[in-house]
């Protein structure tokens, strides 16, 4: 896969999965725009790519603000000439007991995780539809869109909304040659992988916990031009956990 003529925007790219995805595209030759609210970490992440000779810039962005998103798209297009791929990764996770969950917290989480996907896609697709090859959009959902634990109402609603929004967008943008897919990660360790316990790994069918690179490789597959027959799906990457029986032996 050659992405040397592609401009990729990754939101929430200062660390974790987003940073891993940014690295994955940069390695394949893409020009990468890292967007995040954390300016210090974002500048550092972009610099680490630039030091390797890769094309990368950081643009401070609050995905809750439509004006920030419009500015992100304008600067990205001005810097690299086009917008070809959007990775909607920005999000937050907070688990508050139901009877303590205030509407302000609910709104903030849904605005960050779900509304941002709508706003970023709406803004980016205006540029993508001008491309001869169209474009590709990936929305990061979660396995918590399909399964839950206590106190996850706001987070689950936001991620479930992303899955539904994804196939709606795939339908709406199909005439503009833009594919839209979701990825639902399971346990992706973004901290010290070496500190994980043996039982952490063995509870997965894959016999290991996931890494950001697992998500990056999926993004590369779903955004490759030759894979334009894949659109509207939710790709679950969880080492088999959502297919595992929960009953103890």
Functional labels for PLM-detected ranges:
Residues 126, 171-175, 228:
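Alpha-helical segment proximal to the catalytic Tyr-Lys
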Residues 14-16:
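Conserved glycine-rich cofactor-binding loop
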Residues 121, 158, 166:
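Active-site helix of classical SDR
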Residues 87, 174, 179, 230-232:
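Short, small/polar-rich loop/turn modules that mediate ligand/substrate recognition or access, typified
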Residues 142:
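Residue(s) in the substrate-gating loop at a strand-loop-helix junction
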Residues 97-98, 105-110, 200-201:
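Substrate-binding pocket helix/loop in short-chain dehydrogenase/reductase
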Residues 147, 220, 231-249:
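Short C-terminal tail/terminal secondary-structure segment
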């Amino acid at each position: 896969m050659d992405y040397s003529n592609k401009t990729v925007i990754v939101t929430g790219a200062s660390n974790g999965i987003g940073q891993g995805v940014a690295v994955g595209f940069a390695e394949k030759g893409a020009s990468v725009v890292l967007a995040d609210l954390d300016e210090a970490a974002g500048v550092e992440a972009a610099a680490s790519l630039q030091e390797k000779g890769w094309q990368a810039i950081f643009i401070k962005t609050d995905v809750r603000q439509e004006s920030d998103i419009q500015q992100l798209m304008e600067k990205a297009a001005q810097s690299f000439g086009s917008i070809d791929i959007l990775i909607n990764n920005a999000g937050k996770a907070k688990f508050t007991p139901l009877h303590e969950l205030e509407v302000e917290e609910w709104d903030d989480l849904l605005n960050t995780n779900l509304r941002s996907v709508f706003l970023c896609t709406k803004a980016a697709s205006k540029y993508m539809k001008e491309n001869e090859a169209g474009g590709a959009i990936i929305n990061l959902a979660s396995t918590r869109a399909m399964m839950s634990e206590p106190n996850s109402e706001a987070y689950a609603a936001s991620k479930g909304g992303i899955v539904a929004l994804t196939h709606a967008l795939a339908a709406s943008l199909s005439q503009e040659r833009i594919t839209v897919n979701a990825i639902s990660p399971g346990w992706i360790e973004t901290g010290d992988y070496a500190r994980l316990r043996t039982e952490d790994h063995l509870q997965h069918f894959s016999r290991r916990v996931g890494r950001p690179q697992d998500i990056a490789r999926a993004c590369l597959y779903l955004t490759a031009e030759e894979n334009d027959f894949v659109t509207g799906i939710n790709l679950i990457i969880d080492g088999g956990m959502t297919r595992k029986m929960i009953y103890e032996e």
